[in-house]
Protein backbone atom coordinates (compact mmCIF):
# COMPACT_ATOMS: atom_id res chain seq x y z
CA UNK A 1 0.00 0.00 0.00
CA UNK A 2 1.38 3.43 -0.97
CA UNK A 3 -0.36 5.34 1.82
CA UNK A 4 2.15 6.57 4.44
CA UNK A 5 2.07 4.24 7.42
CA UNK A 6 1.12 6.98 9.87
CA UNK A 7 -1.95 7.82 7.75
CA UNK A 8 -3.24 4.32 6.98
CA UNK A 9 -5.71 4.12 9.86
CA UNK A 10 -7.10 7.55 8.98
CA UNK A 11 -7.49 6.58 5.31
CA UNK A 12 -9.23 3.35 6.29
CA UNK A 13 -11.62 5.38 8.45
CA UNK A 14 -12.26 7.80 5.56
CA UNK A 15 -13.09 4.98 3.15
CA UNK A 16 -15.32 3.29 5.72
CA UNK A 17 -17.28 6.43 6.60
CA UNK A 18 -17.63 7.51 2.96
CA UNK A 19 -18.18 4.26 1.08
CA UNK A 20 -18.62 1.53 3.71
CA UNK A 21 -15.40 -0.23 2.68
CA UNK A 22 -12.03 -0.56 4.40
CA UNK A 23 -9.91 -0.62 1.26
CA UNK A 24 -10.09 0.73 -2.28
CA UNK A 25 -10.33 -1.62 -5.26
CA UNK A 26 -7.44 0.25 -6.89
CA UNK A 27 -5.04 2.93 -5.73
CA UNK A 28 -2.47 4.89 -7.72
CA UNK A 29 -0.37 7.83 -6.62
CA UNK A 30 -0.63 10.92 -8.84
CA UNK A 31 2.84 12.36 -9.26
CA UNK A 32 1.87 15.84 -10.43
CA UNK A 33 -0.39 16.31 -7.42
CA UNK A 34 2.21 15.23 -4.89
CA UNK A 35 4.39 17.97 -3.47
CA UNK A 36 5.21 19.93 -0.33
CA UNK A 37 4.29 17.09 2.04
CA UNK A 38 0.99 16.39 0.30
CA UNK A 39 0.26 13.05 -1.34
CA UNK A 40 -2.56 12.62 -3.85
CA UNK A 41 -4.01 9.31 -5.00
CA UNK A 42 -6.56 8.09 -7.53
CA UNK A 43 -8.62 5.50 -5.71
CA UNK A 44 -11.34 3.33 -7.25
CA UNK A 45 -14.29 2.14 -5.16
CA UNK A 46 -16.98 -0.02 -6.77
CA UNK A 47 -15.77 0.97 -10.21
CA UNK A 48 -15.82 4.74 -9.63
CA UNK A 49 -12.62 6.79 -9.31
CA UNK A 50 -12.12 9.39 -6.58
CA UNK A 51 -9.29 11.67 -5.52
CA UNK A 52 -7.77 11.02 -2.11
CA UNK A 53 -5.63 13.81 -0.69
CA UNK A 54 -3.37 13.12 2.28
CA UNK A 55 -1.73 16.13 3.94
CA UNK A 56 1.43 15.29 5.87
CA UNK A 57 2.10 18.77 7.20
CA UNK A 58 0.87 19.87 10.61
CA UNK A 59 -1.01 23.12 9.91
CA UNK A 60 -4.78 23.27 10.24
CA UNK A 61 -6.53 22.62 6.87
CA UNK A 62 -9.85 24.16 7.93
CA UNK A 63 -9.55 27.12 5.53
CA UNK A 64 -8.55 24.78 2.69
CA UNK A 65 -11.49 22.42 3.26
CA UNK A 66 -13.99 25.24 3.82
CA UNK A 67 -13.11 26.98 0.56
CA UNK A 68 -13.00 23.73 -1.41
CA UNK A 69 -16.41 22.68 -0.11
CA UNK A 70 -17.97 26.05 -0.93
CA UNK A 71 -16.59 25.91 -4.48
CA UNK A 72 -17.80 22.33 -4.91
CA UNK A 73 -21.31 23.21 -3.73
CA UNK A 74 -21.35 25.93 -6.40
CA UNK A 75 -20.26 23.47 -9.10
CA UNK A 76 -16.84 25.07 -9.57
CA UNK A 77 -14.85 22.21 -8.03
CA UNK A 78 -15.37 18.44 -7.96
CA UNK A 79 -17.87 17.16 -5.40
CA UNK A 80 -16.45 16.73 -1.91
CA UNK A 81 -17.17 13.31 -0.45
CA UNK A 82 -15.20 13.50 2.81
CA UNK A 83 -13.02 15.83 4.83
CA UNK A 84 -11.43 15.41 8.23
CA UNK A 85 -9.54 18.39 9.63
CA UNK A 86 -7.86 16.43 12.42
CA UNK A 87 -6.64 13.67 10.09
CA UNK A 88 -5.93 16.15 7.26
CA UNK A 89 -7.58 13.96 4.64
CA UNK A 90 -10.10 14.68 1.89
CA UNK A 91 -11.87 12.63 -0.77
CA UNK A 92 -13.41 14.29 -3.82
CA UNK A 93 -14.76 13.19 -7.16
CA UNK A 94 -12.09 12.50 -9.77
CA UNK A 95 -12.28 14.61 -12.93
CA UNK A 96 -12.42 12.02 -15.70
CA UNK A 97 -11.65 12.64 -19.32
CA UNK A 98 -9.65 15.84 -18.82
CA UNK A 99 -8.49 17.01 -22.24
CA UNK A 100 -6.14 19.72 -23.50
CA UNK A 101 -7.65 23.13 -22.78
CA UNK A 102 -7.41 25.27 -25.95
CA UNK A 103 -6.21 28.77 -25.15
CA UNK A 104 -9.00 30.29 -27.24
CA UNK A 105 -11.59 28.56 -25.06
CA UNK A 106 -9.69 29.36 -21.88
CA UNK A 107 -9.84 33.08 -22.71
CA UNK A 108 -13.61 32.83 -22.28
CA UNK A 109 -14.09 30.00 -19.80
CA UNK A 110 -11.48 30.95 -17.20
CA UNK A 111 -12.64 34.53 -16.55
CA UNK A 112 -16.27 33.37 -16.42
CA UNK A 113 -15.25 30.74 -13.87
CA UNK A 114 -13.41 33.34 -11.79
CA UNK A 115 -16.43 35.64 -11.91
CA UNK A 116 -18.58 32.80 -10.54
CA UNK A 117 -16.01 32.01 -7.87
CA UNK A 118 -15.83 35.60 -6.73
CA UNK A 119 -19.63 35.79 -6.48
CA UNK A 120 -19.61 33.21 -3.65
CA UNK A 121 -19.97 34.25 0.00
CA UNK A 122 -16.69 35.49 1.47
CA UNK A 123 -13.99 32.90 2.12
CA UNK A 124 -12.10 32.83 5.42
CA UNK A 125 -9.03 35.01 5.70
CA UNK A 126 -5.52 33.68 6.15
CA UNK A 127 -2.54 34.84 8.18
CA UNK A 128 -0.18 36.96 6.09
CA UNK A 129 2.76 34.56 6.34
CA UNK A 130 0.56 31.77 4.91
CA UNK A 131 -0.38 33.80 1.83
CA UNK A 132 1.27 31.97 -1.08
CA UNK A 133 -0.20 34.21 -3.78
CA UNK A 134 1.50 37.21 -5.35
CA UNK A 135 -0.32 39.57 -2.96
CA UNK A 136 2.11 38.38 -0.30
CA UNK A 137 4.45 41.00 -1.77
CA UNK A 138 1.99 43.80 -1.08
CA UNK A 139 2.11 43.26 2.67
CA UNK A 140 4.20 45.32 5.03
CA UNK A 141 6.19 44.16 8.04
CA UNK A 142 9.15 42.02 9.10
CA UNK A 143 8.16 38.92 7.10
CA UNK A 144 8.26 40.64 3.72
CA UNK A 145 11.26 42.75 4.75
CA UNK A 146 13.13 39.58 5.68
CA UNK A 147 12.32 37.92 2.38
CA UNK A 148 13.51 40.91 0.38
CA UNK A 149 16.73 41.04 2.37
CA UNK A 150 17.27 37.32 1.82
CA UNK A 151 16.79 37.78 -1.91
CA UNK A 152 19.34 40.58 -1.92
CA UNK A 153 21.86 38.60 0.13
CA UNK A 154 21.61 35.50 -2.07
CA UNK A 155 22.53 37.64 -5.11
CA UNK A 156 20.82 35.34 -7.59
CA UNK A 157 20.11 38.32 -9.84
CA UNK A 158 23.00 40.53 -10.99
CA UNK A 159 23.45 43.46 -8.60
CA UNK A 160 21.92 46.11 -10.86
CA UNK A 161 18.95 43.87 -11.65
CA UNK A 162 18.38 43.12 -7.97
CA UNK A 163 18.23 46.86 -7.35
CA UNK A 164 15.68 47.11 -10.17
CA UNK A 165 13.54 44.36 -8.66
CA UNK A 166 13.55 45.99 -5.22
CA UNK A 167 12.76 49.40 -6.69
CA UNK A 168 9.84 48.08 -8.76
CA UNK A 169 8.51 46.16 -5.78
CA UNK A 170 8.61 49.28 -3.62
CA UNK A 171 6.91 51.28 -6.37
CA UNK A 172 4.08 48.79 -6.83
CA UNK A 173 3.58 48.21 -3.10
CA UNK A 174 3.26 51.95 -2.52
CA UNK A 175 0.64 52.43 -5.24
CA UNK A 176 -1.43 49.24 -5.25
CA UNK A 177 -3.66 49.89 -2.24
CA UNK A 178 -5.69 47.11 -0.62
CA UNK A 179 -9.41 47.81 -0.99
CA UNK A 180 -12.26 46.12 0.84
CA UNK A 181 -14.44 46.25 -2.28
CA UNK A 182 -11.83 44.30 -4.26
CA UNK A 183 -11.55 41.37 -1.82
CA UNK A 184 -13.24 38.19 -3.03
CA UNK A 185 -13.13 34.39 -2.76
CA UNK A 186 -9.90 33.34 -4.45
CA UNK A 187 -8.16 30.11 -5.42
CA UNK A 188 -4.66 31.66 -5.28
CA UNK A 189 -2.81 28.92 -7.16
CA UNK A 190 -3.81 29.47 -10.76
CA UNK A 191 -0.36 30.08 -12.19
CA UNK A 192 -0.37 26.30 -12.83
CA UNK A 193 -2.51 24.89 -15.64
CA UNK A 194 -2.87 21.61 -13.72
CA UNK A 195 -5.31 23.36 -11.38
CA UNK A 196 -7.78 24.16 -14.19
CA UNK A 197 -9.13 20.92 -15.65
CA UNK A 198 -11.29 20.92 -18.78
CA UNK A 199 -13.38 17.84 -19.60
CA UNK A 200 -14.73 19.16 -22.90
CA UNK A 201 -17.88 20.51 -21.29
CA UNK A 202 -16.92 22.14 -18.01
CA UNK A 203 -13.90 23.67 -16.35
CA UNK A 204 -13.06 22.53 -12.84
CA UNK A 205 -10.80 24.24 -10.32
CA UNK A 206 -8.82 21.77 -8.20
CA UNK A 207 -6.22 21.89 -5.42
CA UNK A 208 -7.70 24.44 -3.01
CA UNK A 209 -4.94 24.39 -0.43
CA UNK A 210 -3.96 28.05 -0.99
CA UNK A 211 -7.52 29.43 -1.13
CA UNK A 212 -8.73 32.35 0.99
CA UNK A 213 -10.36 35.78 0.67
CA UNK A 214 -7.92 37.78 -1.45
CA UNK A 215 -7.66 40.65 -3.92
CA UNK A 216 -9.83 39.67 -6.89
CA UNK A 217 -7.09 40.62 -9.35
CA UNK A 218 -4.63 38.04 -7.99
CA UNK A 219 -6.32 35.04 -9.64
CA UNK A 220 -7.25 37.11 -12.67
CA UNK A 221 -3.63 38.17 -13.29
CA UNK A 222 -2.03 34.79 -12.53
CA UNK A 223 -4.20 32.95 -15.04
CA UNK A 224 -3.93 35.73 -17.62
CA UNK A 225 -0.15 35.55 -17.56
CA UNK A 226 -0.50 32.09 -19.12
CA UNK A 227 -3.22 32.63 -21.68
CA UNK A 228 -3.45 36.32 -22.61
CA UNK A 229 -0.96 37.05 -25.38
CA UNK A 230 -2.25 40.24 -27.02
CA UNK A 231 -4.40 43.31 -26.51
CA UNK A 232 -7.22 41.55 -28.33
CA UNK A 233 -6.92 38.58 -25.97
CA UNK A 234 -7.03 40.93 -23.00
CA UNK A 235 -10.20 42.58 -24.31
CA UNK A 236 -11.91 39.19 -24.51
CA UNK A 237 -10.59 37.99 -21.15
CA UNK A 238 -11.48 41.09 -19.13
CA UNK A 239 -14.77 41.55 -20.95
CA UNK A 240 -15.86 38.06 -19.93
CA UNK A 241 -14.77 38.65 -16.34
CA UNK A 242 -16.47 42.01 -15.85
CA UNK A 243 -19.43 41.27 -18.11
CA UNK A 244 -18.63 44.41 -20.11
CA UNK A 245 -15.64 46.33 -21.39
CA UNK A 246 -13.41 47.23 -18.42
CA UNK A 247 -12.84 50.85 -17.50
CA UNK A 248 -9.43 52.52 -17.23
CA UNK A 249 -9.12 51.85 -13.51
CA UNK A 250 -9.92 48.14 -13.87
CA UNK A 251 -7.39 47.79 -16.67
CA UNK A 252 -4.77 49.62 -14.60
CA UNK A 253 -5.29 47.50 -11.51
CA UNK A 254 -5.20 44.31 -13.58
CA UNK A 255 -1.99 45.35 -15.35
CA UNK A 256 -0.22 46.29 -12.12
CA UNK A 257 -1.20 43.00 -10.49
CA UNK A 258 0.31 41.22 -13.47
CA UNK A 259 3.60 42.98 -12.68
CA UNK A 260 3.34 42.04 -9.01
CA UNK A 261 2.90 38.44 -10.17
CA UNK A 262 5.96 38.69 -12.42
CA UNK A 263 8.06 39.84 -9.45
CA UNK A 264 6.59 37.16 -7.21
CA UNK A 265 7.36 34.28 -9.60
CA UNK A 266 10.79 35.71 -10.37
CA UNK A 267 11.59 35.62 -6.67
CA UNK A 268 9.91 32.27 -6.04
CA UNK A 269 11.61 30.41 -8.86
CA UNK A 270 14.96 32.14 -9.30
CA UNK A 271 15.66 32.68 -5.64
CA UNK A 272 13.63 30.30 -3.52
CA UNK A 273 13.37 27.23 -5.78
CA UNK A 274 16.60 27.35 -7.76
CA UNK A 275 18.39 25.27 -5.16
CA UNK A 276 21.24 27.74 -5.15
CA UNK A 277 22.18 26.73 -8.70
CA UNK A 278 24.16 29.40 -10.48
CA UNK A 279 22.44 31.03 -13.43
CA UNK A 280 24.35 31.69 -16.62
CA UNK A 281 23.12 35.16 -17.51
CA UNK A 282 25.05 35.05 -20.78
CA UNK A 283 22.41 32.62 -22.05
CA UNK A 284 19.30 34.40 -23.36
CA UNK A 285 16.03 33.74 -21.58
CA UNK A 286 13.33 31.75 -23.34
CA UNK A 287 10.60 33.63 -25.17
CA UNK A 288 7.85 34.39 -22.66
CA UNK A 289 4.81 33.58 -24.82
CA UNK A 290 6.39 30.41 -26.22
CA UNK A 291 7.33 29.20 -22.73
CA UNK A 292 3.86 29.88 -21.34
CA UNK A 293 2.24 28.12 -24.30
CA UNK A 294 4.35 25.02 -23.69
CA UNK A 295 3.66 25.26 -19.95
CA UNK A 296 -0.09 25.57 -20.60
CA UNK A 297 -0.15 22.47 -22.81
CA UNK A 298 1.89 20.41 -20.33
CA UNK A 299 4.98 20.17 -22.50
CA UNK A 300 6.93 21.93 -19.74
CA UNK A 301 6.63 20.87 -16.10
CA UNK A 302 8.13 22.83 -13.23
CA UNK A 303 9.60 19.73 -11.63
CA UNK A 304 13.33 20.08 -12.28
CA UNK A 305 15.60 22.99 -11.39
CA UNK A 306 16.42 24.03 -14.99
CA UNK A 307 12.70 24.43 -15.79
CA UNK A 308 12.15 26.40 -12.59
CA UNK A 309 15.01 28.74 -13.44
CA UNK A 310 13.72 29.19 -16.99
CA UNK A 311 10.27 29.99 -15.59
CA UNK A 312 11.63 32.60 -13.22
CA UNK A 313 13.68 34.18 -15.99
CA UNK A 314 10.78 34.56 -18.42
CA UNK A 315 8.79 36.36 -15.73
CA UNK A 316 11.73 38.64 -15.02
CA UNK A 317 12.26 39.49 -18.67
CA UNK A 318 8.56 40.18 -19.15
CA UNK A 319 8.54 42.49 -16.13
CA UNK A 320 11.55 44.42 -17.46
CA UNK A 321 9.76 44.88 -20.77
CA UNK A 322 6.45 45.90 -19.25
CA UNK A 323 7.80 48.52 -16.85
CA UNK A 324 9.29 50.39 -19.80
CA UNK A 325 5.90 50.73 -21.48
CA UNK A 326 3.75 53.88 -21.33
CA UNK A 327 0.95 51.73 -19.94
CA UNK A 328 2.95 51.04 -16.79
CA UNK A 329 3.38 54.71 -15.90
CA UNK A 330 -0.25 55.42 -16.77
CA UNK A 331 -1.44 52.52 -14.61
CA UNK A 332 0.65 53.75 -11.69
CA UNK A 333 -0.87 57.21 -12.07
CA UNK A 334 -4.45 55.92 -12.22
CA UNK A 335 -4.08 53.63 -9.20
CA UNK A 336 -2.15 56.19 -7.16
CA UNK A 337 -4.88 58.78 -7.66
CA UNK A 338 -7.58 56.30 -6.69
CA UNK A 339 -5.62 54.89 -3.74
CA UNK A 340 -5.62 58.25 -1.94
CA UNK A 341 -9.29 57.81 -1.18
CA UNK A 342 -9.76 54.06 -0.90
CA UNK A 343 -7.13 52.60 1.45
CA UNK A 344 -8.29 50.46 4.38
Q: Can you name each region flagged by the protein language model?
A:
Residues 30-147, 152-163, 178-180:
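ATP-binding pocket architecture of kinase catalytic cores
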Residues 27-32, 253-254:
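Short, solvent-exposed loop/turn elements at beta->coil junctions and helix N-caps
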Residues 31-47, 51-52, 170-220, 232:
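Active-site acidic catalytic loop and adjacent metal/ATP-binding pocket
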Residues 4-24, 122-188, 199, 235, ...:
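An alpha-helical support segment within catalytic cores of ATP-dependent transferases
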Residues 88-92, 190, 227:
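Short glycine- and hydrophobic/aromatic-rich loop-to-beta-strand nucleating segment
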Amino acid sequence: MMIPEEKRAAVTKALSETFGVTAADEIRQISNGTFNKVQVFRVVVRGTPYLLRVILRTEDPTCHFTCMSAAAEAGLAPRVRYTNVEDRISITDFVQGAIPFPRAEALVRVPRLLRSLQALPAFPGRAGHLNTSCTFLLQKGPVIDGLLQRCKTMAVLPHDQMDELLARHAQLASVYAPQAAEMAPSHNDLFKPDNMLFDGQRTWLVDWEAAFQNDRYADLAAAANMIVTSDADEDIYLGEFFGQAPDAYQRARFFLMQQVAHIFYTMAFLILQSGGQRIDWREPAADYDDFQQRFWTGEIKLEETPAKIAYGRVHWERLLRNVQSPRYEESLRICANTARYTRF
